[in-house]
Amino acid sequence: MTLGERMLHYRARNRISQSKLAELMDEDLMTIYRIENGIHKPHKINEIRLTEKMDKLEAEERGKDTND
């Protein structure tokens, strides 16, 4: 699954906007939009950084699921 697909699936599961995801990841809204839509593929170092942020959000999401 690509980073953009992960972002899209995360947003769908959590019913949040691209704007909210950008806020949670401390990223620019246009960055989220471009990656999700396959318009932009970040440089490797940025992709790693963004992937780490997605990993953290998904881990927090899993933690909420087990605490509910």
Task: Kindly label every feature range from the protein language model.
Residues M1-T2:
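A detector for short, charged/polar N-terminal pre-domain segments
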Residues E5-K20, R49, K64:
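Short basic helix-loop element that most often maps to the first helix and adjoining turn
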Residues A12, D26, N37-I39:
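Residue-level detection of the helix-turn-helix DNA-binding "recognition helix"
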Residues I16-Y33:
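Short alpha-helical DNA-recognition segment
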Residues M25, I35-E36, N46, M54:
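DNA major-groove recognition helix of helix-turn-helix
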Residues H43-G63:
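DNA major-groove recognition helix of helix-turn-helix/homeodomain DNA-binding modules
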Residues T66-D68:
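Helix-turn-helix/homeodomain-like alpha-helical modules used for DNA recognition
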